[in-house]
């Protein structure tokens, strides 16, 4: 019956009667009480007379003496209708949620832990009883802040709805409890929305789950408000540390702030098939912390010694009475505002409290016991996420250790080497972690910044690190420690420049800490004024750095002092990170020592002669026994190449070995690259910062593959040329050095020519007019010149290489552009000749798996009708676009321009297929020559009015091909096909970064022999050969590996157009090698799988093969092509990889040096 009693509603001194209405959605008051008020919005209002739009006002009312702020609408009635939400005290039914909290136990714990006197504890107990409605009594209980609702959907672009993540089944019961409790309190409502945000459950330390929503999509389109939280470091530095300290946690503070109903939609999320919206500020929303903190700060203004950081409140006083009085004021304001307090997370009237993750005492701030427990529970990480979590935890306490940065550097160096589920954690990393934990557990308290005192900054530097300490003037305890590890550039600085670098970085932070006070800098520099007289020859840093350093001398806020108590730079001890690079050979079963050497050739050319030496030891019962040694000559290469080659050789020998293995090299570059840089190089595609291929790229790729096969091999660096008693590795290192030096002299020690028997017979038969061996034509002359077998043919003298070296020559010529048989033959015939060259080349081409995967069906095509071509260069250009390709460096198209007479090709990557891009490219190209005719298809890039005007100004005739008839532009269309094949084979097994390969593709296209003319496009265009490296005539080995490194990767055969793969002009047979078509291959990926044998023939059109997954599969021959270069269905060699017969017959011998 109490609900039927009228209520007293007061507005601006006018009192009227009001009645509680359980069905009212909004409070209604007479319009006379709203005179002079401006409406905040409009809303549809439903009454017995229908639905109509009305103005909504936000006003202050008193209902039964209680002041409230609420939204109302005006009516013609002379009394007020009040919604239940505005008078929650009318319904005396207590709040009931899922999990009840024990307030008596929490209050008792706070009373027992406080340092209050007996009287003070009684007063605190009375405060607990007085503000009983202020304490959180249920888990997920929410306050109700009566303020104007926030407008949060302030962006101009609607966010994109997001899909829901997979939910851990263990989290669903806890999340459901939270949603049910919030629905009871009106914090959530069930409502459909065009937006959706995924729910992301996060585990709590107690084993339960917290409901978190991923509002990144909403935050991306929401403007950031200007009011933001103060940085926690600034708050910690300005805390008043009285005897009595209290920290208060405002429970679910964001959920106490209402938002306007028209913004509910942007907060929506889906749970168990139903969509819910927040009626309050959601957690995770961009502007929630700023809006909430700003309200709490305004609410607590006037209370001394109070600091607020989001939902954490700190208050401290020296007097017990004063502290309790201000707690009473603080509790009253929070209760009247509608907040609730979590006593479980609060600490009242104590001498030591935890605030913002630190322990606050009268001495200063320190690390909490909870943080130290987390340190003790750290274990070696096995995933990248665990490593990052450990680094984040340690980095929180970085200001408590003077040399923190240099100690943690080895752990940060693991990040680029780690993968999602692998971290290369070693013993030295565990030692580093233990050192950090020990120092953090023993770290002293740091003092807070006192704004009435001058800031003292003390700096010093070692060879690798700069050290900084901040103090309040006259105090002994530091405010903070900072350490700076010098970069690679800064390590080259002089001692003075390293100190100035440390001063510069320290002052950047000191200006924030100074609080308007002066800064005094103490350093080992005797006179800062004298550094202006530093001569240019004594400077290693750039002039811009010196300018910024000297600018501090003019700043009136900063004064510099010499501190004679600081140790001189040269006397600082070396940094000990606990890392021992020495690996004793007795701890390993197999030990390899590698070295490389190079000497200058005594010949007129002055080439380098390189050699490598490798020694292999076995550990038997603690005694090292030399097992084998190698001394191998490498020809015209650098010493660095020899070091890498020797290292690669040792890794290959490690593959079949069992047990732990140690490889020792005297090259710091090789050891550091293998241990620290190789994984980063592999992830970047073996290019440097300028996107250029690394030196010796082919060797490093091989080493990376070997490391993946044997990641357990330990590699260490040992300086060379040491005395035998100075290191356990000295003997093996010196022996490897002797073998490498010996190998570098081998080229000139060998005097007898290494000829085959048939070559010797041919020379002798020619001299004695006897019968020549089979395959050697009698019309030619055969002689021995410079230890080489030479033949005089119609086109001049040619070398006949030994049979064991012919495979290398064919492989080298083919790998330049993976050309076909005729093109390879022409390339080799420039310098060499031997019997049955075509047969040997065909045998080799049949072994190239990459060509088999990309080349079309190799059947003889029908000859097309001859096309009349121009006879002079630059008369006519064909042009067309390739693309869109996968994005690379922002480019998605390639403009191909082909000279009609010579076939010379220009490739220009573009970001768009437009006339502007075309004109830009042709302006560059016409700087060489202006063509008479430009032939293209009828694409918009070539038919626009702008392009036609450009051509008219240069007197260029435009010629277009017939629509839907690409044969009209056959020359450029064929080039397009060749370019795509080149890029496809080049990118096999590599990321689709084709932009940096365009220049190499163009070089390969223009320097591949055309069978019809027997010349390359470059020769036809310019009349001379391109400066393209081919073979080392002295050692039959590559002489310019860096230039060939990328060309060697181009895997494409520039064949003539052939019939489509669906051509049925072949019949399968059992045992035949065939290749299956790839279903819908992506751009720049192979179109055919690797060769496999035909197992059974079901009918003339269907066969059974073993597919790439190892399963038997029936396939139509329309989806197959016969593998090229087969003879009666068998390979030329039994090697499963299809190795050439010459290679199979060749026996590889290793030079074993007698240990005596």
From Swiss-Prot:
Gene3D superfamilies: 1.10.340.70, 2.30.30.140, 3.30.70.270, 6.10.20.110, Acid Proteases, HIV Type 1 Reverse Transcriptase, subunit A, domain 1, Ribonuclease H-like superfamily/Ribonuclease H
Molecular functions per Gene Ontology: aspartic-type endopeptidase activity; DNA-directed DNA polymerase activity; metal ion binding; RNA binding; RNA-directed DNA polymerase activity; RNA-DNA hybrid ribonuclease activity
Domain Integrase catalytic: 869-1025
Function recorded in the entry: The aspartyl protease activity mediates proteolytic cleavages of Gag and Pol polyproteins. The reverse transcriptase (RT) activity converts the viral RNA genome into dsDNA in the cytoplasm, shortly after virus entry into the cell (early reverse transcription) or after proviral DNA transcription (late reverse transcription). RT consists of a DNA polymerase activity that can copy either DNA or RNA templates, and a ribonuclease H (RNase H) activity that cleaves the RNA strand of RNA-DNA heteroduplexes in a partially processive 3' to 5' endonucleasic mode.
Biased composition (Polar residues): 1144-1156
GO biological process, alphabetically ordered: DNA integration; DNA recombination; establishment of integrated proviral latency; proteolysis; symbiont entry into host cell; viral genome integration into host DNA; viral penetration into host nucleus
Cysteine disulfide links: none
Post-translational modification: Specific enzymatic cleavages in vivo by viral protease yield mature proteins. The protease is not cleaved off from Pol. Since cleavage efficiency is not optimal for all sites, long and active p65Pro-RT, p87Pro-RT-RNaseH and even some Pr125Pol are detected in infected cells.
The EC number(s) this enzyme carries: 2.7.7.49, 2.7.7.7, 3.1.26.4, 3.4.23.-
Gene that this sequence comes from: pol
Name used for this protein in its record: Pro-Pol polyprotein
Keywords attached to this entry: Aspartyl protease, DNA integration, DNA recombination, DNA-directed DNA polymerase, Endonuclease, Host cytoplasm, Host nucleus, Hydrolase, Magnesium, Metal-binding, Multifunctional enzyme, Nuclease, Nucleotidyltransferase, Protease, RNA-binding, RNA-directed DNA polymerase, Transferase, Viral genome integration, Viral penetration into host nucleus, Virion, Virus entry into host cell
Description of its domains: The reverse transcriptase/ribonuclease H (RT) is structured in five subdomains: finger, palm, thumb, connection and RNase H. Within the palm subdomain, the 'primer grip' region is thought to be involved in the positioning of the primer terminus for accommodating the incoming nucleotide. The RNase H domain stabilizes the association of RT with primer-template. Integrase core domain contains the D-x(n)-D-x(35)-E motif, named for the phylogenetically conserved glutamic acid and aspartic acid residues and the invariant 35 amino acid spacing between the second and third acidic residues. Each acidic residue of the D,D(35)E motif is independently essential for the 3'-processing and strand transfer activities of purified integrase protein.
């Amino acid at each position: 019956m109490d609900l039927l009693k009228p209520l007293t509603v007061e507005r601006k001194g006018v009192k009227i009667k009001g009645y509680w209405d359980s069905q009212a959605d909004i409070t209604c008051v007479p319009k006379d009480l709203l005179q002079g008020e401006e409406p905040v919005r409009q809303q549809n209002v439903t009454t017995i007379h229908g639905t109509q739009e009305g103005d909504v006002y936000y006003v202050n009312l008193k209902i039964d003496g209680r002041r409230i702020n609420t939204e109302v609408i005006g009516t013609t009635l002379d009394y007020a209708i009040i919604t239940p939400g505005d008078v929650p005290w009318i319904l005396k039914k207590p709040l009931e949620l899922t999990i009840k909290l024990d307030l008596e136990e929490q209050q008792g714990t706070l009373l027992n832990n406080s340092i209050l006197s007996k009287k003070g504890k009684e007063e605190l107990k009375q405060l607990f009883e007085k503000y009983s409605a202020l304490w959180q009594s249920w888990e997920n209980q929410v306050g109700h802040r009566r303020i104007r609702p926030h407008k949060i959907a302030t962006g101009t672009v609607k966010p994109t709805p997001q899909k829901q993540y997979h939910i851990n089944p263990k989290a669903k019961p806890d999340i459901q409890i939270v949603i049910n409790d919030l629905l009871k309190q009106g914090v959530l409502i069930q409502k459909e929305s065009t937006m959706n945000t995924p729910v992301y459950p996060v585990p709590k330390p107690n084993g339960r789950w917290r409901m978190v929503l991923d509002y990144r999509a909403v935050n991306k389109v929401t403007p950031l408000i200007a009011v933001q939280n103060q940085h926690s470091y600034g708050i910690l530095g300005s805390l008043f540390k009285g005897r009595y300290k209290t920290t208060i946690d405002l429970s679910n503070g964001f959920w106490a702030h209402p938002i306007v109903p028209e913004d509910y939609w942007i907060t929506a999320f889906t749970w168990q098939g139903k969509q819910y919206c927040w009626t309050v500020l959601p957690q995770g929303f961009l502007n929630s912390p700023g809006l909430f903190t700003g309200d709490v700060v305004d609410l607590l203004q006037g209370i001394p010694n109070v600091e607020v950081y989001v939902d954490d409140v700190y208050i401290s006083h020296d007097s017990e009475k004063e502290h309790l009085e201000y707690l009473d004021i603080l509790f009253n304001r929070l209760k009247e505002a509608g907040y609730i307090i979590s006593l479980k997370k609060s600490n009242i009237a104590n001498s030591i409290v935890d605030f913002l993750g630190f322990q606050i005492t009268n001495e200063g701030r320190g690390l909490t016991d909870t943080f130290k427990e987390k340190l003790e529970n750290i274990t070696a990480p096995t995933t990248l996420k665990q490593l990052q979590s450990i680094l984040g935890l340690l980095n929180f306490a970085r200001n408590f250790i003077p040399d923190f940065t240099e100690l943690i550097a080895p752990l940060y160096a693991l990040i680029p080497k780690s993968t999602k589920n692998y971290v290369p954690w070693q013993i030295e990393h565990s030692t580093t972690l233990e050192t950090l934990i020990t120092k953090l557990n023993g770290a002293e308290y740091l003092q807070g910044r006192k704004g009435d005192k001058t800031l003292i900054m003390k700096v010093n530097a070692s060879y690798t690190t700069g050290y900084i300490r901040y103090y309040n003037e006259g105090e002994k305890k530091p405010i903070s420690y900072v350490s700076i590890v010098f970069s690679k550039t800064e390590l080259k600085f002089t001692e003075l420049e390293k100190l100035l670098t440390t001063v510069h970085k320290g002052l950047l932070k000191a200006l924030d800490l100074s609080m308007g006070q002066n800064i005094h800098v103490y350093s080992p520099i005797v006179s800062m004024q004298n550094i202006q007289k530093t001569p240019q020859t004594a400077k290693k840093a750039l002039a811009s750095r010196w300018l910024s350093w000297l600018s501090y001398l003019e700043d009136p806020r900063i004064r510099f002092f010499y501190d004679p108590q600081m140790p001189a730079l040269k006397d600082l001890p070396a940094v000990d990170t606990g890392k021992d690079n020495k690996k004793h050979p007795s701890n390993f079963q197999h030990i390899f020592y590698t070295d490389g050497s190079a000497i200058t050739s005594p010949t007129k050319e002055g080439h380098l002669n390189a050699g490598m030496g490798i020694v292999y030891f076995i550990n038997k019962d603690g005694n090292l026994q030399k097992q084998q040694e190698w001394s191998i000559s490498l020809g015209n290469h650098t010493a660095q190449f020899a070091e890498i080659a020797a290292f690669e050789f040792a890794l290959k020998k490690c593959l079949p070995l069992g047990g732990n293995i140690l490889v020792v090299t005297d090259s710091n570059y090789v050891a550091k690259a293998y241990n620290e840089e190789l994984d980063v190089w592999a992830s970047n595609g073996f290019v440097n910062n300028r996107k250029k291929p690394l030196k010796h790229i082919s060797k490093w790729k091989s080493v990376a593959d070997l490391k993946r096969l044997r990641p357990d091999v330990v590699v260490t660096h040992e300086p060379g040329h040491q005395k035998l008693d100075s290191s356990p590795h000295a003997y093996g290192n010196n022996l490897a050095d002797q073998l490498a030096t010996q190998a570098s002299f081998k080229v000139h020690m060998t005097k007898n020519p290494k000829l085959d028997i048939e070559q010797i017979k041919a020379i002798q038969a020619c001299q004695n007019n006897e019968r020549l061996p089979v395959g050697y034509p009698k019309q030619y002359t055969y002689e021995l010149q410079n230890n080489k077998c030479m033949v005089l043919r119609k086109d001049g003298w040619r070398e006949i290489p030994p049979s064991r070296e012919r495979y290398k020559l064919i492989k080298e010529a083919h790998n330049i552009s993976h050309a076909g048989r005729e093109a390879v033959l022409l390339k080799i015939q420039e310098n060499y000749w031997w019997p049955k060259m075509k047969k040997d080349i065909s045998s080799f081409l049949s072994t190239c798996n990459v060509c088999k995967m990309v080349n079309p069906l190799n059947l003889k095509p029908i000859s097309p009708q001859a096309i009349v071509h121009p006879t002079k260069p630059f008369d006519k250009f064909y042009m067309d676009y390739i693309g869109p390709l996968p994005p690379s460096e922002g480019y998605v198209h390639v403009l191909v321009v082909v000279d009609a007479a010579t076939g010379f090709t220009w490739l220009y990557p573009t970001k768009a297929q437009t006339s502007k891009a075309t004109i830009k490219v042709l302006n560059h190209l016409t700087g060489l020559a202006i063509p008479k005719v430009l032939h293209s298809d009828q694409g918009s890039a070539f038919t626009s009015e702008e392009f036609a005007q450009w051509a008219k100004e240069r007197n260029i005739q435009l010629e277009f091909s017939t629509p839907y008839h690409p044969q009209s532009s056959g020359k450029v269309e064929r080039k397009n096909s060749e370019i795509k094949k080149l890029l496809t084979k080049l990118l096999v097994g590599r990321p689709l970064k084709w932009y940096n390969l365009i220049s190499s593709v163009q070089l390969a296209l223009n320097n591949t022999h055309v069978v019809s003319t027997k010349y390359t496009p470059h020769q036809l265009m310019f009349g001379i050969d391109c400066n393209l490296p081919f073979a080392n005539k002295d050692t039959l080995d590559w002489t310019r590996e860096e230039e060939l490194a990328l060309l060697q990767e181009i895997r494409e055969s520039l064949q003539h157009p052939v019939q489509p793969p669906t051509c049925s002009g072949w019949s399968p047979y059992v045992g035949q090698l065939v290749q299956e078509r790839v279903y819908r291959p992506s751009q720049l990926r192979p179109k055919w799988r690797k060769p496999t044998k035909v197992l059974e023939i079901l009918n003339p059109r269907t066969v059974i093969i073993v597919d790439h997954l190892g399963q038997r599969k029936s396939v139509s021959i329309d989806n197959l092509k016969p593998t090229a270069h087969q003879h009666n269905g068998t390979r030329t060699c039994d090697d499963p990889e299809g190795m050439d017969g010459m290679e199979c017959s060749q026996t590889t011998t290793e030079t074993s040096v007698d240990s005596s």
